[in-house]
Design a protein with these regions (language model features):
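Terminal processing/anchoring signals of secreted or surface-associated proteins
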Residues: 460, 467, 496, 515, ...
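Short, disulfide-bonded extracellular cysteine-rich repeat modules
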Residues: 466-476, 514-522, 565-571, 616-622
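Residue-level detector of functionally pivotal "anchor" positions at catalytic/ligand-binding pockets or at interdomain
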Residues: 448-457, 476-484, 528-532, 578-588, ...
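Coil residues (strongly favoring Ser/Thr
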Residues: 71, 102, 132, 141, ...
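C-terminal outer-membrane/trafficking sorting elements
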Residues: 36-37, 630-678
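Histidine-/acidic-rich catalytic cores in large beta-rich domains
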Residues: 3-452
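Short beta-strand edge segments in extracellular beta-sheet folds
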Residues: 475, 522-526, 573-577, 624-630, ...
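Solvent-exposed segments in extracellular or luminal domains encompassing
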Residues: 488, 497-514, 539, 548-565, ...
């Protein structure tokens, strides 16, 4: 049996390829396919309409797609007119039309986080209105001067629950022209980079003047990218505006209304460059690289290169100014927007060229999935090496699959875009993915293997028996030892267990990586410190213990915190000693040099001095001094009381003496302290 030479289907699937499911459709077919990395069909949707261009698999498993409806007014590549959502059984659960004599949906759309849908559409601008806005007149081959109609771009945001347009933007509101100062939108083009030159990229023959072919939304910035291949630029717009602000040049978070916030690809479009500055040539699929991917936040473009004759995938890093309301840095009034150079680019001038349609996607491992639409080819390159690691030719001509060995005719299997999803994508939860057969007829025998990255070590706790490629993700049980010294009454939490007594404990926990983690814990208890202290203080003094102040006698208990964090119980006993005082009476004869408590006294009167007694408290000594010329004991006896005896300081009876203190004790109980000095 002679096998056909391979012409379609899967050509290669290397281990370096990112495993997943690839969504695509052929523009000549009403079917949309989901295939695995071996090219085997795992799901299929059927519609009554060919796609205008793009299709999207939503997070709930429904398919959002553009629809190609009949139009009697408009005819250009990417015409649509309809949008529909198909459930997993291909039932139409929602549809919407932008298809009239003056408007038409085309090419692309974008679903927003709130469920609303951004729709790319054109609106017909009459030649008369274009003339009032500064559009140039044109001369045909016969010499006839004429004006031309225009197709201008607009974006409609539709709520699919109500079918209401809740926001819109019109390119025609943001024009600039420098041909006639008496007409609308006159100005210096280079001074208005936020506006669209009405006379750029238009020769009067093709009214599809802007031909936007893709739209993307960045929820973090609340900004929109639309792509104009005829201008060789993509434009970024502010979506935070109201519809009224979107028609103006003020408003929104950026403060610039609906004017272009940033543009890149060919600064000739706003008179700030020349042919050497042009990078893009009829490019497609300008979009932000999503969060979580290696080049998140950068912008990826399929640069068709229809002038140079080869295509490239380009990535740029836009000069976003987060400190200036998410506007973009423009150095001065004469230079174009940066960057000056591409961040990254891939091309293969021999094997890779699509002069129209097409797109690209960065995958989770950094690889790039490329849909070379005109070739009907979907392939994947390894990001770091540019090596082709997956290669597939769409086996369709128009609406029908073709047999292996049949070469698709030029443009017979064109594809607008392809997208690969991780096997864990939420949209698959509502789909039954059943590998069936490849799409092509009479397929060749295949030994294709699905390469699944994961842990291939059976000893690891995240061992994946389906994994065929060890991706160094294996994780193993962790043994952890820890020791704690805690205070009485405190505790240690290990997993769901709480320990508050001394000892050794073993716990098995489940880590975030899916492995068991064995924890050995030793706990020691530090009891509270007990401290006893006693103080004898004087009346009026105080003792500070922690934050408390004590100035009365008694027993007190305080709980303090030590430097190790544990409690210290302090018992304090306080004795309050009274301050003392004494009163002396003294009679001396004149001319005696007398010192009393260090103080010279020689004049009759009262004296006082504060001393420190034996317990350290104040002792106030008072002296009444009398200077007399009489010697001896005065008034020992009187009619009111009788002297009983005289004692010294030791209580011993003593005869009358001079120059020593004596105590005179009377029968009425009174005692006088006297000293006669001569």
């Amino acid at each position: 049996m002679t096998l056909a030479q391979q012409t379609v289907g899967l050509f290669s699937n290397l281990p370096e390829s990112y495993n997943g499911y690839t969504l695509f459709n052929s523009l000549g077919s009403t079917n949309t396919y989901l295939i695995d990395n071996c090219g085997v069909k795992v799901y299929e949707w059927n519609s009554n309409f060919k796609p205008a261009a793009s299709v999207y698999l939503l997070e709930n498993g429904n398919l959002l797609k553009t629809s190609q409806l009949d139009s009697t007014t408009f005819s250009f590549g990417g015409t649509g007119g309809g949008i529909e959502i198909l459930d997993p059984n291909s039932n139409v659960i929602w549809s919407y039309e932008v298809n009239s004599d003056s408007t038409l949906a085309h090419h692309d759309l974008e679903i927003l986080p709130n469920g609303n849908i951004l729709i790319l559409a054109i609106e017909l601008i009459s030649a008369q209105e274009a003339d009032t806005c500064g559009s140039l007149s044109y001369t045909d081959s016969s010499g006839t001067v004429f004006s031309a109609d225009r197709y201008s771009e607009m974006i409609l945001e539709v709520n699919p629950t109500t079918d209401q347009i809740v926001w819109e933007w019109h390119a025609w509101d943001h024009l600039i022209q420098d041909t006639d100062s008496n007409l609308l939108y006159y100005g210096t083009i280079s001074e208005h980079p936020g506006r669209i030159n009405i006379n750029y990229a238009f020769d009067g023959t093709d009214p599809d003047w802007l031909h936007a072919n893709s739209i993307d939304y960045n929820a973090d910035l609340d900004q929109i990218i639309i792509n104009s291949p005829t201008f060789n630029e993509f434009w970024i717009l502010d979506h935070s505006t109201t519809t009224a602000e979107a028609a103006d040049s003020i408003g929104g978070f950026s403060g610039n209304g609906g004017d272009i916030l940033y543009r890149w690809g060919d600064p000739q479009a706003y008179n700030r460059g020349d042919t050497l500055d042009q990078v893009f040539e009829f490019q497609h699929d300008a979009h932000w690289i999503p969060s979580g991917l290696p080049d998140q936040g950068k912008i990826m473009i399929f640069n068709n290169g229809n002038q140079r004759g080869y295509s490239s995938i380009d990535i740029i890093e836009p000069p976003l100014d987060t400190n200036n309301s998410n506007n973009y840095i423009l150095t001065n009034n004469s230079t174009p927007y940066g960057p000056l150079n591409l961040y990254w680019s891939y091309s293969d001038s021999i094997n890779f060229y699509s002069p129209f349609i097409s797109g690209a996607q960065q995958l989770e491992n950094g690889n790039i999935l490329i849909c070379s639409g005109a070739q009907g080819k979907i392939f994947e390159i390894e990001y770091q090496t540019d090596s082709v690691v997956w290669d597939y030719i769409i086996p369709m001509v128009g609406p029908n699959p073709i047999a292996q060995g049949t070469t698709p005719p030029p443009m017979g299997n064109i594809c607008f875009r392809a997208h690969r999803f991780s096997p864990s994508y939420s949209g698959f939860n509502n789909l039954v993915l059943t590998p069936s057969t490849v799409i092509e007829l009479n397929p060749l025998p295949s030994n294709c293997q699905i390469y699944i990255s994961g842990c291939t070590d059976s000893l690891a706790c995240n061992y994946d028996p389906l994994a065929t490629i060890n991706d160094s993700s294996c994780v193993y049980p962790v043994i952890w030892q820890q020791a704690f010294v805690i205070c009485t009454g405190d505790s240690v939490v290990v997993g769901s267990n709480t320990y508050n007594t001394a000892g050794n404990y073993t716990d098995t926990l489940n880590a975030v990586n899916g492995c068991d983690s064995i924890i050995y814990t030793n706990i020691s208890i530090t009891p509270p410190a007990i401290w006893q202290q006693s103080y004898s203080i004087c009346d009026g003094d105080s003792i500070v213990v922690g934050s408390n102040v004590y100035n009365t006698a008694g027993n007190y208990t305080d709980t303090l915190t030590l430097s190790n964090g544990c409690d210290s119980i302090v018992y304090t006993n306080i004795v309050v000693d009274d301050n003392t005082s004494s009163y002396d009476t003294l009679s001396i004869i004149p001319n005696i040099n007398l010192y009393w408590n260090g103080i010279p006294v020689s004049v009759s009167g009262d004296y006082s001095v504060t001393l420190i007694n034996s317990v350290g408290c104040d002792s106030i000594a008072n002296l009444n001094l009398t200077i007399t010329n009489t010697t001896g004991i005065l008034n020992i006896n009187n009619t009111e009381r009788t002297l009983v005896k005289i004692t010294n300081m030791l209580g011993q009876e003593t005869p009358y003496r001079k120059n020593i203190p004596l105590f005179y004790i009377y029968d009425d109980g009174t005692v006088e302290k006297r000293m006669v000095i001569e």
